[in-house]
Amino acid sequence: MEDPLGEVAADFSVRHVSGADGWRLRTFSWTPTDAEAAEGRPVIVIAGWTSVVEGWKPLLQKWVEQRPIHYIETREKNRTESPAGHRQRPVDFEMVQHCRDLATAVHDLGLDAEECDWFGSSLGSTAILHGFKEGILDGRSAFLIAPNGEFKFPGWAIPFTWLPWWLYAPGIRLLVIPYLKLRIKEKEQYIRYRRSMLSADLKRLKLSTKMNLGYTIWEGLEKVKVPCAICVAASDTLHGHGESERIAELLPRGEIIEVPSNQFTHEAGVIPVIQAWQAELTPTE
């Protein structure tokens, strides 16, 4: 596979790494060609629900030249490999399963989680936080964009979970995409979500939606020891700021960082913001 980022000053590889219980997660890895940068702390990137790596291209093109980056896809993504003969069920997409996957994947990559910085978005942010509070994951720091305190779907979308997955394609085109266009103010954010939804594995989309419906993150956040920056965007109308602020308040080392837009978090301009926050962390943290 060619590097999805194009020509960058970094060595690229892609492979499926071990997840929990025989699942295998597609993982993109980059190591800077600059010898000093290649020795930097690794960054583990966990993107949002059904997100595709191309949506992060403006950020990653710059970042992979500065830090070793490992972009791990969660198990609802369409390139994830499930165990042979396994009949997929909603419980396969429970939040704790994502955490167990990530812990196994980090080990398979030969990384020491305590020496890594995490970067997550939406579902990815939520999975990282859940892993921290349950003691499944560890890290040096985590920069988390719009983690979900709860998964709130519009009332009209709930009946979708009762339908066969093969009916999702017309539903996404006729209802979900127009809804997103009305709901999302940022054009670039809408384009990313549209692309993600149209390329999603529909069966896994249905199963993970059913599993996420009853999820809440609140209990146990006070146990998280890893410093966490909770990043919110002023113009992001899809993710609730109230939830992010509550999460930051409950985290012993939580801090709110506001940026101009959701698109900004997908571009190289967010790198100095992350670096400035990480520079303030004391060695003991």
PLM region spans:
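Short alpha-helix in the alpha/beta-hydrolase fold that links the catalytic acid
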Residues: 226, 240-249
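Conserved alpha/beta-hydrolase catalytic His-Asp/Glu region
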Residues: 153-155, 169-222
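Acidic catalytic loop of the alpha/beta-hydrolase fold
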Residues: 234-239, 263-264
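Catalytic active-site module of serine/aspartate enzymes centered on a nucleophile-bearing elbow/loop
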Residues: 253-285
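Short beta-strand/loop motif that positions the catalytic acidic residue
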Residues: 224, 230-232
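Active-site loop/oxyanion-hole signature of alpha/beta-hydrolase fold enzymes
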Residues: 70-119
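Flexible "cap/lid" loop of the alpha/beta hydrolase fold
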Residues: 129-133, 137-168
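Conserved HGGG/HGGXW glycine-rich cap/lid loop of the alpha/beta-hydrolase fold
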Residues: 23-84
